[in-house]
Amino acid sequence: DRVGGAIAEIAGEAFELGPIAQGPGKIAKVTAKVRILDPRVTREVGELITFGIRIPLEIDMVVDLRIDKPKFMVFGEISLRATAQAAEPLLLILDVEKPRPSDISIHVTSKSLRAEVVRIVGGVDAEIKRFIAAHVAGEIDSPASKKAKIIDVAEQVAESWGT
């Protein structure tokens, strides 16, 4: 639970991107509203304690082409790995690997044939993965994230014992 809470802090909740100029001559302007859902964490105990992390997300995206504004709905999941390292006195430090675009799976839908053509010709799926990977990598390095990756076990034991 503590690791899941730390990962949720690192992942954040919702954010907006854009408008970001894309395509030939940077003619297209992309905006997106991203919702981060509750992460699912599975623990694997071996020589090291590692965690498989799956962070579901939903994105409402608009590509403004000046003559048309196709809208897309994206459902996806970010797959991360983390390793827990013990530190003195009673700290648990999470080392979260930064995602690559290949660690992100998405399903993109739209309501028009024109939007589907824009999606295919413009390589929209690959761009979405690239932007998400870059954003999450930035979040992993953020000051708030660095703080969230340190779990004070002694403090939590004291709280549970009421001392």
Language-model features and meaning:
Residues 1-2, 6-7, 115-163:
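Extended, low-charge, aliphatic-rich alpha-helical segments
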Residues 1-104:
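Hydrophobic-cavity lipid-handling domains and compact docking modules
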Residues 104-118:
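Short secondary-structure boundary motifs at beta->alpha junctions and helix caps
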